[in-house]
């Protein structure tokens, strides 16, 4: 399928996607009943969309195009109410978190969807292992060239986005020692990590044409980059965050990305170059492994900075943009999080350290989501 032309969209508008866990009480393992839930709610959703993701234990909540995070929060809140009621009617529960702490990937059923079945044929068991749960944020752009500039700018802050949203310390019944283990699942995919370097939309079109020669890439949706342009929506899509435990934190993360995008495209503070990516995977690893306690390294100077310190600097820089976008409350909440040193991954570990079981942890996450 050829790459579509870049659809011009209103700059800085938002679209947010949350991949949620569908679980079976009282054992709180992943369910395989998302299709049943979707059928139950599809005619009751008035704004946004509830749809499938890769496997039958995943449920995706997606907003419509929103002008700001308050509109997005309203849509999510309405969807959440409908989904929770349907889940209760079917003796299921819903929660966030980037991974389910003890599910077995071998048990996961790939959705009966042509695209997902084709992906299963291409990638085999890797697709079942990709039963992990992330937050994706789309930001509108006026042109393809703006999208490429924005993608490179946002890529500088991938460690910050990962650290602030880290919520996947447990996987397959084990403490991984990572704050965010979810991104590691995609490391075996040939398109993992950052997008290959291009400097404008014309070069991106040539890149996509080259990738399509492999026959594994039929559309932009088949690419698993950390950040990717979405020409059919006219957006740049940030894909590195774990699904938070609360709707409020998901909205705050979207506000952060919207405000950062506004700052990048209005101030144009960077002259991007391929060398910017030399230490990308090392800095990304620091955020995944240590969260905000990680250290990032500047590829141009060799300077090493605590991620906590650099995140506070970012929040300060984008504060005026956040005000213009109506996202100041999000930036203030994230600032409090960084200063406190708390994140969801550590809260999960604290629960287990205090004697809680992994089953109890999932139950707690369901209570948190339902009570938010």
Curated annotation (Swiss-Prot):
Pfam families given in the database record: GCS2
Record bears the keyword Ligase: yes
Enzyme Commission number, as recorded: 6.3.2.2
Domain of life of the native organism: Bacteria
GO terms (BP aspect): modified amino acid biosynthetic process
Keyword Zinc: no
GO MF annotation terms: ATP binding; glutamate-cysteine ligase activity
Keywords (A to Z) from UniProt: ATP-binding, Ligase, Nucleotide-binding
InterPro entries: GCL_type2/YbdK_subfam (IPR050141), GCS2 (IPR006336), Gln_synth/guanido_kin_cat_dom (IPR014746), YbdK (IPR011793)
Recorded catalytic activity of this chain's protein: L-cysteine + L-glutamate + ATP = gamma-L-glutamyl-L-cysteine + ADP + phosphate + H(+)
Gene3D superfamilies listed in its UniProt record: 3.30.590.20
Family: Belongs to the glutamate--cysteine ligase type 2 family. YbdK subfamily.
UniProt-listed PANTHER family: GLUTAMATE--CYSTEINE LIGASE 2-RELATED
Subunit structure, as described in the record: Homodimer.
Classification via HAMAP family: Glu_cys_ligase_2
Protein task: ATP-dependent carboxylate-amine ligase which exhibits weak glutamate--cysteine ligase activity.
UniProt protein name: Putative glutamate--cysteine ligase 2
């Amino acid at each position: 399928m050829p790459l579509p032309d870049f659809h011009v969209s209103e700059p800085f508008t938002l679209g947010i996607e949350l991949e949620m866990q569908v679980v079976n009480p009282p054992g709180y393992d992943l369910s395989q009943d998302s299709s049943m839930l979707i059928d139950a709610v599809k005619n009751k959703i008035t704004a946004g969309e509830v749809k499938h993701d890769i496997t039958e234990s995943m449920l995706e909540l997606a907003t419509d195009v929103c002008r700001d995070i308050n509109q997005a929060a309203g849509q999510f809140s309405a969807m959440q109410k409908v989904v929770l009621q349907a889940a209760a009617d079917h003796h299921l529960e819903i929660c966030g978190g980037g991974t389910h702490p003890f599910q077995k990937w071998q048990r996961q059923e790939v959705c009966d969807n042509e695209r997902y079945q084709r992906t299963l044929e291409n990638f085999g068991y890797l697709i079942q292992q990709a039963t992990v749960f992330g937050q994706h944020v789309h930001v509108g752009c006026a042109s393809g060239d703006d999208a490429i500039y924005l993608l490179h700018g946002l890529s500088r802050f991938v460690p910050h986005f990962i650290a602030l949203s880290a919520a996947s310390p447990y996987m397959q019944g084990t403490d991984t020692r990572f704050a965010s283990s979810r991104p590691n699942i995609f490391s075996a995919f040939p398109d993992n990590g950052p997008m290959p370097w291009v400097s404008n939309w014309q070069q991106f079109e040539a890149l996509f044409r080259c990738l399509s020669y492999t026959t594994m890439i039929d559309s932009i949706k088949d690419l698993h980059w950390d950040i990717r342009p979405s020409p059919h929506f006219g957006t740049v899509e940030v894909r590195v965050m774990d699904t938070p435990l609360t709707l409020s934190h998901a909205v705050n993360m979207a506000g952060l990305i919207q405000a950062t995008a506004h700052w990048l495209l209005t101030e144009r503070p960077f002259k991007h170059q391929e060398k910017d990516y030399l230490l990308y995977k090392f800095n990304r690893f620091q955020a995944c492994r240590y969260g905000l306690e990680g250290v990032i390294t500047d590829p141009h100077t060799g300077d090493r900075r605590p991620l906590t310190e650099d995140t506070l600097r970012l929040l300060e820089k984008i504060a005026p943009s956040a005000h213009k976008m109506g996202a100041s409350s999000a930036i203030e909440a994230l600032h409090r999080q960084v200063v406190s040193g708390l994140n969801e991954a550590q809260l999960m570990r604290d629960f287990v350290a205090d004697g809680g079981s992994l089953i109890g942890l999932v139950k707690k996450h369901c209570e948190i989501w339902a009570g938010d």
